[in-house]
Amino acid sequence: RDFPLADRLAERTGAVVVVDNDAKALALGEGWCGAAVGERSFLAMVVSTGVGGGLVLDGRLLGGAAGNAGHVGHVVVDPDGPQCACGNRGCLEAVASGPAIQRLTGAPPAEAPPEVRRRTGDLVGRAVATVVNLLDIQLAVVAGSVALGFGAPFFEAAQQRLDLECGLDFTRGARILPAGLGADGPLVGA
């Protein structure tokens, strides 16, 4: 923070430099050559140390007033859940991030039991359903060490929740997919 990284890199390289977050870079990578190829509107999420998002609508990556459009980590998915660093209770990041999983289980996320993997997927599906219902998108692409590490139980639970909560004509059939580029998605997008 408070370091002019883009300016310094531009001075040294002579290139145009833009600094952004991993989830927005994931959105670009997945849209170019990953699971979202051909989609004009979608959400890309990283579920890892934190929970972030990048949002593409009508072919454009959204920035937002502070550059954080699509940041789904602070969508409340469990109002009675633990307090989040932002001050709210039950934000997705407070219940689904790697540190949250470790607090819950007392072990690294890689050692989480199947029921925790499914519950985490369910909560991510709930947040994605909010975005799908609000913005009329049909796809969420998810990466990050927690999501990809939890694998099929995570993605199956996420899709089941999405199916339950997206019953409108224009939201029915929305999908949650693992990032086609895996952990390399943000690098490709950068």
Task: Give the predicted meaning of each segment.
Residues 18, 42-46, 52-54, 83-85:
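Short glycine-aspartate micro-motif
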Residues 68-77:
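Short, intrinsically disordered, charge-biased short linear motifs at domain edges
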Residues 1-25:
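N-terminal glycine/serine-rich phosphate-binding loop of ATP-dependent small-molecule kinases
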Residues 7-15, 29-39, 61, 76-190:
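ATP-binding/phosphotransfer module of carbohydrate and carboxylate kinases, centering on a glycine-rich
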Residues 64-65:
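A short alpha->loop->secondary-structure connector
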Residues 57-58:
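A cytosolic small-molecule/anion-sensing beta-strand core signal
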Residues 22, 48, 190:
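Active-site glycine-centered loops adjacent to acidic/histidine catalytic or metal-binding residues
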Residues 48-50, 146-147:
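Short glycine-rich anion-binding loops that position phosphate/pyrophosphate groups of nucleotides
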